Amino acid sequence: MSRQFTLGLVTLAGTAVFGLVGPAAADGIAMSHRYASLGDVSAVYHQPTRPLFGMETKATTGDVSSKWQAVEAEIEQEKIILTHCRIEQACPAAARELLDIVAEGADRVGRARVGWINRAVNLALIPTSDEAQWGVADRWSPPFETLQTHRGDCEDYAIVKYVALLEAGLSRDDLKIVILRDFVHNEDHAVLAARVDGEWLILNNNSLTLVRDSDMVGAKPMFVLDQDGAHRLRAIARV
């Protein structure tokens, strides 16, 4: 998943659609009260909604599942560090940077907060393939590692946003990393889906614009990764 491309907002016959529009471009730091918990920004809007992309899911195993399990384990360890950072006077630099991103969105709510964190993460990192950075075809990094190098590819962006939005108060039920198939470049791409006000929004690593899952064209959703593991997406069978 090395190619960097934008899933951007396009207008066709007056209708907004989601399309592929090309590439965009010190430990021991004292902490402050602004890192206090921001509360759940999505729970108040919890209501029955259509499934993500209007598709059903089926649990899956294999490479995607194994990589997600490994990253999830590291995320849980890093969340413990983030919890300590909120109450102690010192914190690793990468943890501080992640909490800075979260804190900068503290005066925003709902979609505005999600959009701010999407923007902040996109601007904090430099798109870099795993081959260029690590010398391997595909590597999924936990948030602190990505923020230490300030480089990563699509799934690294999505993972940082996933944890940042958890720290910002979104429920785990409202966050899913999505692996897509890009038909334009014939390769895979990862984004984050966040549910706000009962609506699924797509956060892309090269777009500052949030768009609805129902407006996406040019790519096929294949897998979702969340608190329940890895699942394959498939069309809902009609009866």
Features from the language model and the residues they span:
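Hydrophobic helical h-region of N-terminal Sec-dependent signal peptides
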Residues: 11-14
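A structural boundary/capping signal
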Residues: 2-8, 19-239
